Amino acid sequence: GSQLAGEIGAISAEHLIVCPPEGIASMAKGGVIACLLPATSFNLGAVFAPARDMVNAGVPVAMATDFNPGSCPCLNMQFVINLGCLKYKLTPEEVLTAVTLNGAAAIDLADKVGSVEEGKLGDLVIWDAPDLDYICYRVGSNLAKTVIKRGEIV
């Protein structure tokens, strides 16, 4: 799927767990966002996508939970963030981009959400953490202090 996504210039390639080097090269050439589901790999005991290789090749990476009762009963985005650093070997900054702006871009909504900018909907999480590294490597703790959706605290 990754190679075809690059060949046809898809916005994104979804559910990537296994992705050969040819697929990575094709996505890089086609400007395709690779959508990765680390909690699915974790739950299934499957391999983890070669995210570091993708980023090194210039492929934008997005990450999500893929919550479903069969292959991924995980709703926890902080766990996805943890896995992004620990299993994908991405930096905290790369992971933050993957779960925000690149995720929005993968569903063609980067003009509305994914970053804090004037004119966007105002979705934001305030973390109880001294820095971004703490969020990425503190596994098993809910560090979300405040969640703001469309400018309103929820």
Residue map of PLM features:
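Short, glycine-/Ser/Thr-/acidic-enriched flexible segments
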Residues: 39-42, 68-69, 131-132, 152-154
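Conserved beta-strand positions that form and line the central face of beta-propeller blades
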Residues: 12, 115, 146
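His/Asp/Glu-enriched, well-ordered alpha-helical/loop segment
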Residues: 7-8, 47-129
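C-terminal cap of metal-dependent C-N hydrolases
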Residues: 99-101, 121-154
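Active-site core of metal-dependent hydrolases
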Residues: 1-49
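Residues in and immediately flanking transmembrane alpha helices
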Residues: 27-28, 79, 136
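Thr-Gly-centered strand-to-loop micro-motif
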Residues: 13-16, 36-39, 63-65, 71, ...
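Structural beta-strand/beta-sheet cores of well-ordered domains, especially the beta-sheet scaffolds
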Residues: 30-32, 57, 122, 145
